[in-house]
Design a protein with these regions (language model features):
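Regulatory modules associated with amino-acid/nitrogen control
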Residues: 116-134
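N- or domain-start disorder-to-order transition segments that initiate the globular core
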Residues: 2-3, 40
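Conserved small/polar residues in nucleotide/adenosyl-binding loops
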Residues: 138
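Gly/serine-rich nucleotide phosphate-binding loop at the start of the catalytic core
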Residues: 8-42
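Glycine/proline-rich, flexible active-site/cofactor-binding loop segments
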Residues: 32-84, 90
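Conserved phosphate/anionic-ligand binding catalytic regions in large, soluble enzymes, centered on
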Residues: 94-119
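Short, structured patches in soluble enzyme cores that scaffold and shape functional sites
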Residues: 23-26, 106, 112, 133-135
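Short, conserved phosphate-binding/catalytic loop or strand-edge motifs used
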Residues: 81-86, 125-129
């Protein structure tokens, strides 16, 4: 089992942060049409119930944006993934088809409003993962 921890910077800036970690064995595949039908249904529901100017007012997204600000990140430049996905939907831009696991994580993110990370435990070196803030400048 991988040991997951939160950096001191995040723990200090976001004392109410809750993290859920699930571990499971899965078999990934190319994009699945049944899953993409479910994603299409969710896209339709988002278009029917959400306005572009309301996205960042939704509590899960609003909380993530506040956390970004506390950590020195501009949430208008570095949008939470759940917000970015909903914005793509409302702009009628297609969502990227990556693979079944990534597409499923994106669907859960769209529905829940929470940004979700998926990691391959076999690729985590040293058996531990620290959730932190990237301080590298992006060009």
């Amino acid at each position: 089992m991988t040991n997951i921890s939160i950096s001191e910077e995040i723990a200090t800036a976001c004392p109410d942060l809750h993290v859920l970690a699930l571990s499971c064995d899965v078999c990934n595949s190319e994009p699945d049409e049944r899953l993409w039908q479910e994603i299409a249904d969710e896209e339709k529901a988002v278009r029917e119930t959400v306005k572009l100017e309301q996205i960042n007012k939704w509590l899960p997204i609003q909380a993530t944006r506040q956390a970004y600000k506390r950590l020195g990140k501009d949430p208008n430049r570095y949008r939470p993934s759940s917000e970015a996905l909903r914005r793509r939907i409302l702009r009628e831009l297609p969502l990227y088809k990556v693979d079944t696991l990534v597409d499923l994580i994106n669907l859960v993110s769209i529905r829940s409003g929470y940004s979700i990370g998926g990691f391959d435990a076999d690729k985590i070196s040293g058996g531990s993962l620290v959730l932190g803030v990237d301080r590298k400048s992006v060009v």
